[in-house]
Amino acid sequence: DMKDYIVKSLDRIEWVANDILEQKELLDFDEFARRYEANVRAMIKEKDLIALKSIIAYTTGLEVKVLPEKEVREGYYRYLCDRTSRADEKIIRDYCFCKACEICQELDIPMQVHTAFGDSPLCDLGKCNPLNMYEVINAYKDTKLILIHAGYPFCEELGFLMNHYENVYG
């Protein structure tokens, strides 16, 4: 009997970015950034989310870089010209992940991150090691990062991160 339980949701940030990038209208970077942040915030509010979720491990990998805006802006425009560029897609996905971490920090909700081996055909196991998140973990020390699937097969690495960083959970 579930009547005594409250069920809450979380949702993927990648869907928000994908919806914007797949529109026929080409946006300048400032408008993309504005819409992404506004849409993530709206998703949290409308769905009463208790966390955000990312599958970045399965798209461009866990080595998320905190990049200067100039570099993100340039990568965004290159990506609009060549949507097959994995390097420029990574720049955009890293930017979106970092922006979501900022929102999570501000709203005091966690970011749930898929780690370990996934089911996507784009998944590169070497890019799924939780230790690859070193830069972003340090950059967003006030964002709670829940690294799920025990980092398998990198369980020891996930344990190391949980032991050394107060903002990392598994």
Segment roles from a protein language model:
Residues G61, G75-G170:
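Catalytic pocket-lining loop regions of alpha/beta-barrel enzymes
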